[in-house]
Regions:
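Generic hydrophobic, helix-prone segments enriched in Leu/Val/Ile
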Residues: 26, 34-38, 54-62, 112-114, ...
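A near-ubiquitous, low-amplitude feature marking generic local secondary-structure context
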Residues: 40, 44, 76, 124-131
Length: 152
């Protein structure tokens, strides 16, 4: 989507390699983002499957040191469900990161969506991190999800 006009490699994302992301500024120092990448598990550890991978990526992202001056962070409303996209099986995990205290004026929460699919190249991920209440970003994220996955 046009509002996601900044490109960079995502940070704070465990188990993901070769990722490229697009970002939209919410306000100074805070962004909504989306990216695609390859899922790479820990060397010497058997890949646990797409369901566990999608859940672990969300959990590790929540625990990462990327949340700036926010306080009282909680991971709420987590749901994991099977999906099939373009004939490729996988799992989608959604959750909301709520902040008890945040320096931002436009949002106090972030919506997370992680989709891990089996692809011919191995497990792949599509992730959205969207500032809740920023309508332009929420609409663009929904549009991107629909265009890439056919899943609304």
């Amino acid at each position: 989507p046009a509002v996601y006009d900044q490109r960079q490699t995502p940070r704070g994302v465990a188990y993901v390699n070769d990722a490229q992301g697009a970002y939209a500024q919410v306000e100074d120092g805070w962004y909504s983002g989306m990216f695609v990448g390859a899922v790479e598990w820990q060397p010497g550890i058997e890949y646990p499957g797409n369901e566990v991978a999608s859940e672990k990526i969300v959990a590790c992202y929540f625990a990462a040191s990327i949340w700036g001056d926010t306080e009282g962070r909680t991971l709420d409303d987590q749901v994991t469900e099977p999906v099939t996209i373009a004939g490729l099986p996988g799992y989608r995990t959604t959750a909301t990161v709520n902040f008890a205290k945040a320096p931002m004026e436009k949002t106090s929460a972030t919506s997370l969506t992680v989709i891990v699919l089996d692809t011919p190249q191995g497990p792949s991920v599509f992730m959205l991190e969207t500032a809740v209440g920023v309508a332009e970003h929420e609409e663009a994220a929904a549009e991107a999800l629909e265009s890439l996955t056919g899943v609304a």
